[in-house]
Amino acid sequence: MLADFRNYDPKNQYYPTLQADFNQHKDFAIGAPAPDFKLPSATGDTVHLHDFAGKLVYLNFWKSTNGLCLRDLAYAQELMRKFEGKNITFINIALDENEQAWKQLVTVKKLPGVQVRVPGGGLRSMVAKEYALQEVPTYMLVGEDGTFLNTKPKRLSSRAAVDEINQSFGKASTYTSAIDFPATKK
């Protein structure tokens, strides 16, 4: 489709911009491998995305200083309870600069799911760049095979999130079988 646009842009005014945008976002297409990460958890363990191969993974990028992120915490707990015992893991990736404040919130609120933090935090961190994060909260749904199913799933507070997650189980190979992507970086 992008190549077809060249016919409508004979002076090549817009094509380079569209090509750059396409190149930036193709890594997040449905079926593309999600970038792996290695992050410290609130309990001191090291967590990698590939640790959850074979499971549906709901990624929640957040900050403890963001009001919208904090409001969604209650919904996150409720959503995780609804999927308890199912083949899904909720990974909450904090982009907090202040490790102590993050750990305290995780401990005091007894936040469920996998709680990890990006050392140094912020939207300029390597993880934020690899996932092209522009803001928090940001949610992503990764299939059992480690590929993106949805880079803009329903928010934790949305009633439709439950249906969307239920419909995502077992969908990973549907998208990746038709597309030849390079191997996921580990």
Where are these regions (language model features)?
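Generic structural signal for well-ordered beta-strand positions
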Residues: 47-48, 149
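Structural microenvironment flanking redox-active thiols in thiol-disulfide oxidoreductases
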Residues: 71-109, 122-129
